[in-house]
Amino acid sequence: MIAGIIAVAFEKPTTKDFVWPCWGPSIHVGGISFCMNFVFFLLLLAMGIYIALFYLAFRRPKTIPGRLQALMEMGLEFVREQIVMQMIGPEGMPFFALLSAFFFFIFFANILEVLPGVNLALTSRIAFPIVLAIVSWVTYNAVGIRRHGFTGYMKLVLFPPGAPIILYFLLSPIEFFTTILVRPVTLSVRLFANLVAGHFLLAVFFLGSIALLSSAVTFVFGLVSGAMAVVMVGFEIFVSLLQAFIFSVLSASYIAGAMASEH
């Protein structure tokens, strides 16, 4: 009975549901169209939230901070102590701005998922996590090359200190693929997959609640589904914060590894 009601209420998605049309004229470069659409609007929205909060918090900083300034200072202190100092140490302070930007911007991009009227995390579009992962990848490799030189950095990557020489034929390819190829993939896919999964769960519970509440027979189940949807909203806020933290911590650990004399 319940399955039948849900099946009747369910409208099968089409490919059009995954394509956002342009809101105005587009620019074509090499067969690729660039235009303002819903996803680009989300990027501007996340950037706007990021800039506005920091501007409002620190435009007139006070010795005794107000609520917003205290909240943002608490967030920056968290990044400095729990990410920069824990993963890299005092030498990591030049990367404090980058890691803070990762943490806050990813969180604001993630939290759009539970914002009424938006309900789509910017990071649930794979292109955005890929760009962030590339920035992280370029940063830690540039740090390693600058610290050790290209040859010295490649030596540290390909020949881990302390390993028996006979194992290098096995370890060197693994280290190369892990450091140079796998890390940006895992960084981007981890962030993307977690936010997509959360989006699907929210959609299932909210749409299931609407479908079940439409019938007296399944009304109680609709209430349960609606309650679970509310719980999932809170859980997704936690996941949004957690994924921002994980991305920033991993980026910091990669930078620390590139700076170290030994892996």
Identify the function of each model-found stretch.
Residues 1-263:
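Selective transmembrane helix interface/packing segments
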